[in-house]
Every structure is written in C-alpha cells, then in structure tokens.
Amino acid sequence: MIYFDNAATTLRKPDCVIEAVTEAMGSMGNSGRGVHDGALSASRTIYDTRAALARLFGAEGPERIAFTANSTEALNMAIKGLLAPGDHVITTALEHNSVLRPLYELEDRGMELTILGADALGNICYEDFEQAVRPNTKAIVTTHGSNLTGNLLDLARIGSVARAHGLSYIVDASQTAGVFDIDVRRMNIDILCFTGHKGLLGPQGIGGLYVREGIEIRPLLSGGSGVQTYLRSHPPQMPTALEAGTLNGHGIAGLGAAVKYLQETGLDTIRQKEQALMRAFYEAVRQIPGITVYGDFSSMDRCAIVSLNVRDYDSGEVSDALSESYGIATRPGAHCAPLMHRALGTVDQGAVRFSFSHFNTEEEIKIAVSALQELAQEE
C-alpha cells in the first residue's frame, strides 16, 4: 500500500516508538500509585516525555504539559474549561469539528461566537481579528494548519492581537506539531492542543495540551490523582488538575520516543522532505486536465497536504478507485471541516486529500500522479 493519509494518522512510525511501547507494556506500573520499580519507571517516563514536549514547544517547564487521549479531548478541555455564557469568542472557517462543535455547544448555552470567513483559496484576512474584538471577547481559537487545504495561519500575528487585547489564544496544532517550529511564548499562545499520532509520530490514543502559567482551566474530569487523597476536590495544580485517573503510560512512552526521534532527525529535515514531495505532486497534478486542486500554493511553506477532485466524480468513488486499482490510500469526503468545504464550494462532492510523510518517496508520488492521469481520462 502507498499511504497518503498521514493527515489522519501517520501509519509508519519510527522503530524506536514501537520498541518503547512494547517495552513499557511489559514493565510499566501505574505512575504515582506506588514506590516499586514499575511505578517509578512509569513516573520517570511520563516526566521525561513532559520535559521533552515542553522543550519542543518552548514551554516554561514540564508541569505546563498535561496529557489527554487526543487533541479533541484537549480542545474540549480548553474551550469548555475556559469559556462561559456571556463570553465572546473569535474563530475561523478553517477549523476542524473538534473546535467548532464545542464552540457551537457553548453558543447554544449563551456564549457569543464570531466565525471569520475564508476566501476561495482558503485564506483568512488577519485584519478581521482586530475588527471582531468586542468588550466581552474572552478568547481567540484557531487551527495552525488546515487539515483540508494545508494552508497555515500566522500564529505570532494572531497571538499579538490576542495579547494586545488581553485575550486568551487557544491553538489547535493537530496538523503541525512535530513538523513546524512552535514556540508558545514567542507566539503568545496561551493554550496549545496537540495529538501524538500525526506529525509527532507517536501512538494513537495519546495527546495533550500546554497551558500557560496563570491560565486556569476548569477541569472536565475529577477523581483519582495519586496525590492529596484527602481533598474533597481534585488537586488544582498543573498538570494534576487536568489528569484525573490513570494516564496512558504506554502511549506516553511511545510519544516520548517519537519526540526524541524528531529532535535527533530535525524538524527542518522532516518538513523540507514532506514539502518537497508535496511540491512535486502539486506541480504534476495541477497540469492534468480535469483535476481541480484546492488551497493556496503561492508559498510552499505549508502543510504537506494536497486536496483535489477529478472532474465531477464523487470524491469517495475516486478514493475507492485509487485504493482498489492502485493500492493508494487517501481520504475522501468532508474531513470534519464543514465550513472550509462551504468556502471552497465542495460540500456535495467533497475532496480527495493526499497528505505526505517524510517516509514517503518520490517513486510513490510518480505512481499517484500516473493513477490520477488515468482516472481523469476515464469517461
């Protein structure tokens, strides 16, 4: 199989990740629940992974990183734990449903919501953020990179608007963590939500969020913590405040190994390889008659994503043909990005998304281009 669905999850993981998970499953106890070797091993692994993520994102320290199951859980924690009825929030049409649906839920309860629109290339106007601020605005919530077009947002520019108005800035880094340099303090990011199974090259079922010192989030969950057992309420200090119950220690072990691999390989090296593959694919397919490509490719400093359609064919049928006839894995449909599809005019047809990993090859790109040429010629 030629795997071009890396924006959904990276299928190929570094060997060190698999080895770390396997070892943890045979030796790891429950962190904070004992003083035996298994429990202490779990605590060390979890701390070391926190520290590695804190360094990766430029956080103040390991205690600012809390683990979750994925970015959806992290975003729900951030959005529902920070906002309340009467608050006003600014977001964009680029967002995934893991941002939109929690915001819609709060809007139904009395929160005010402004969604900044996107143009036909999937871009937003940055001046709109400043103009959308109201006296009761509490936060700005945006993605870093669109999971449909691959377009990037300028986090530092948006963060400066948030900081100037005393707003909290929540970022969904699902598509960019592990590939693009993110410095939460330089970019004025207050909460950064991430998942481990995409660009971070870790296992599924592990993610997390960075929370800036001074930002308090109402926990979604409370319960076992391993510390301060006699408190009636869940301990308030980070990261314990956001980590009720047993953590996914095995997943954290794999994520820690993945972050080490990323740092040793170099984010620049990984990103440049992915973008080179994307550029080669884009330059070839945009010349095929009957192919429509979505997104802004005026700059190749973007996520390694190319979404397209073949003539007026349903995207699901094209993706199925690529899989069945050519062994190429892609993602069709709406990609949990309804507002972006409306902006692009692809609500009915959807789109076929190709997303690349640095483990992909130039030969795989050539095979995919040839397959699309054949499909575009079919009657």
Regions found by a protein language model. Give the residues of each.
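Pyridoxal 5′-phosphate
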Residues: M1-E379
